[in-house]
Amino acid sequence: MNKLNCMMMAGTLLVTACQPTGKTGDVIGKQPVKVENGIMTTEVLMAFGRVSGPVVSPDKSKILYGVSYENLEQNKSNRELFVMDIDGQNKKQITCTPESEGNAVWIDGGKQIAYLSGKSGDSQLWIMNADGSNARQISYHEKGVHGFLFSPDEKHILFIGNVKYSEKASDLYPDLDKATGRVIDDLMYKHWDEWVEEIPHPYIASFDGKQLTDITDIMEGEPYESPMKPFGGIESFAWTPDSKAVAYTSRKKTGMEYSLSTNSDIYLYDLSTQETKNLTEGMMGYDTTPAFSPDGKYPVSYTHLRAHETLRHLV
């Protein structure tokens, strides 16, 4: 048996068949592929699926992970969630939908799984049992949820949601609802190939195991982004071990200053007082990826020594 056939068998063993129980639409999943003349084509590679986001269960007995599959004709991909034993045995697919599921984590001591899904039309936070049953939506944020982080005691959830940043011509002149022009009077109106119309903000909500309440934008009214574009994600946030505060990364600058400087900071938001403190004030570099020591006494982060482009990371 040649190496290519062995690889194909390994890919086949990776997942089980997607068997939806009801009408779910076209599910992009694992497709049969024919290897001709032993050539590793694009189609063969895509048929393997891409494994990502492995998370070990709290009792260290299982692994939760996702597998993404592509459809060339539709120019789309789809990601499903799987669970297997820590030794690689008993693989089970626990989602089977046309919408991708991602950012999955164990909660409730491993009894449940929280994840993002676009099943309701946009990306929202969902919860299901560890075996994939009883899936239910718990967030209904207007502009969708783009990442989330449970507090250590699981009584609060931080999630990322977009807020409006700039006005369009149609906002200023409602009777011109088909207008596509833009009113630009300052930097930074475009980031690479993206018009800056919305920016991400961190929200904190209380969680009782069933629903989100007391949702608060902890940067409400601030014209700054967190996480920072274009690469920032949920790693830009960290809860303190006692669940009483959360650290976040932001570059609180606008206009020309935002365009010329990479000086970002780590901020600490206290849930009880709703006050924010700059933990890296005076540090002029690109401060990112906060974390805390187990006792919560020492915050750490990546940083740069200067406020301009550099590839050297320090801790």
What are these language model-derived features?
Residues K30-G49, I215-G221:
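A short helix->beta-strand "capping" segment at the edge of beta-propeller domains
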Residues T42, N90-K92, S133-A135, L212-I215, ...:
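Predominantly a core beta-strand signature of beta-propeller blades
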Residues T16-A17:
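C-terminal motif of bacterial Sec signal peptides marking the signal peptidase cleavage site
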Residues F48-I63, P98-L116, A135, E142-I157, ...:
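Conserved beta-propeller blade repeats
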Residues T24-I28, N162-G221, T249-K252, M256-D265, ...:
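Predominantly five- to eight-bladed beta-propeller fold
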Residues T303-H313:
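Conserved small/polar residues in nucleotide/adenosyl-binding loops
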Residues E80-F82, Q124-W126, H201-Y203, D265-Y267:
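A short loop-to-beta-strand structural motif that recurs across blades of beta-propeller domains
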Residues I86-Q89, N129-S133, F207-K210, D270-Q274:
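Short loop/turn segments that connect beta-strands within beta-propeller blades
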